[in-house]
């Protein structure tokens, strides 16, 4: 530390180590990120005739994986728009045209990083579980892709891994597949001019938090094909329309909620500061204030689970 260096004297040798490798897919600083967009790092794996794509946003902790057919790779890259894709050199040589057409930066890792047996050990070690069945029945390609992401994070973060949510399978068959050309012409998230302004997303985005903006972008980019999911979202919209006063009050409260996901991520990587700690405290206080308001609403199951986590943090709030 600077204090220790001063004690040793100006002529003493101070040990310096590389503590982080900065890459497009591993950014956590607010000044380098769009508040309302995810910054995904992806890994693509091939095990025999099976393919899988995993992606992570270390600034928010999101970790997902999807088994897919090769024909689905282009649409998935267009949907996620990852800042960086990790893959083995042999896979890149075989499929370079797909990644070049998608316009995503790629990074090569050794074949050992994609070994499914070693990948399983990495995942179990990171999440401290005895078996991957705790998260789902991942096939070898999915396990390989997840393990490669963890290995790459271990390399770039020099052993200081971020706080990640348990891996979730995001089956591509459950959402609408939209190829890059169609997505561009529909101007879903970007206008033909290249910016966000003028797109469908910019037109309908009335969210008041950064996390809400990111969620809307993801849902708009991948429209659900599941009837129960669609009906549940419609019931929540009906709830909002039938309770205008409560919704206005809730939106006013949400405007004061900071970006908790990114604050937590920076703190877990030891890159945070007093402002991030204050954001956690303020966010928990806002959640506590929302609890009575949500109790007055005719909550659907999707909100009942969320509502249960809003309280019980008094000791932590006082400590922070």
Regions found by a protein language model. Name each.
Residues 1-239, 255-268, 272-320:
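Charged catalytic and DNA/RNA-contacting regions of genome-maintenance
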């Amino acid at each position: 530390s600077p204090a220790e260096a001063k004690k040793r004297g100006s002529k003493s040798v101070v040990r310096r180590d590389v503590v982080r490798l900065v890459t497009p897919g591993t950014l956590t600083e607010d000044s380098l990120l769009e508040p309302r967009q995810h910054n995904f790092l992806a890994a693509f794996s091939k095990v025999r005739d099976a393919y899988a794509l995993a992606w992570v946003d270390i600034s928010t902790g999101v970790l997902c994986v999807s088994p897919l057919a090769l024909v689905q790779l282009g649409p998935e890259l267009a949907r996620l728009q990852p800042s960086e894709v990790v893959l083995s050199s042999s896979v890149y040589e075989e499929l370079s045209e797909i990644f070049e057409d998608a316009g995503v930066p790629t990074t090569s890792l050794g074949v050992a990083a994609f070994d499914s047996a070693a990948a399983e050990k990495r995942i179990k070690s990171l999440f401290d579980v005895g078996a991957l069945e705790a998260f789902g029945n991942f096939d070898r390609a999915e396990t390989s892709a997840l393990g490669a992401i963890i290995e790459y994070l271990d390399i770039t973060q020099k052993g200081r891994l971020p706080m990640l949510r348990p891996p979730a399978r995001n089956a591509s068959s459950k959402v609408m597949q939209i190829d890059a050309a169609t997505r561009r012409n529909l101007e879903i998230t970007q206008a033909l001019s290249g910016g966000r302004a003028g797109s469908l997303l910019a037109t309908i985005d009335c969210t008041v938090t950064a996390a809400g903006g990111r969620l809307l972008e993801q849902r708009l980019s991948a429209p659900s094909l599941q009837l129960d999911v669609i009906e549940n979202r419609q019931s929540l919209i009906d709830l909002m329309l039938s309770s205008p006063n409560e919704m206005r009050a809730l939106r006013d409260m949400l405007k004061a909620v900071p970006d908790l996901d990114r604050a937590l991520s920076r703190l877990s990587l030891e890159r945070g500061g007093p402002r991030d700690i204050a954001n956690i405290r303020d966010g928990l206080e806002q959640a506590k204030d929302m609890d009575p308001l949500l109790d007055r609403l005719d909550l659907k199951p999707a909100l009942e689970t969320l509502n249960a986590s809003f309280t019980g943090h008094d000791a932590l709030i006082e400590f922070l």
